[in-house]
């Protein structure tokens, strides 16, 4: 079973549902600030724990692929009454793009998404196994020792650490080899943070298809999901874009 947390307005919404897709080695818990803000704006949202993550329960992820994660999102998408907007962060952004490429989404928003490829990097060897947050620079559970989260306050860092979990080595290697997406049949917004050293705006210069871009001043990679100061201006901008494009 897949765990999904829905936050719905108490009246019939005028907006399409938003599906929130977390990143590698963490869980849907990273979306707590987003869901609160979306509820205040009366947008229905669904955050999903991908298989083996968070509330979806532990399982062996050694052989889990990116296509498996896309299949998890498709299960939720097919239960929506209208085409949803997919919002994915980092690895989740690439999963969102994979599902959107099938024509299932009304629009797609990538928060510093892992980039799709135009061809395979055949030098990458696909391995099985699991890893954790240490591969992303998180080697301590002390909120005061998190160089990967320079813009988060202590409470936000605690939330980030609480979201951590295991991840599929195979899925990561597949991303390194390349997930090919040739075209996207829906509007795309890519959001980047000016303090994100891993996924700056420049990494999307050769995306291969049309996208709009939003730069968030002072936000790191983690800041795009948990830095409340940045989210207070960023989320309204994202919602305005969605209204204009759906």
Would you name each region that the model predicts?
Residues 101-136, 171-177:
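Flexible "cap/lid" loop of the alpha/beta hydrolase fold
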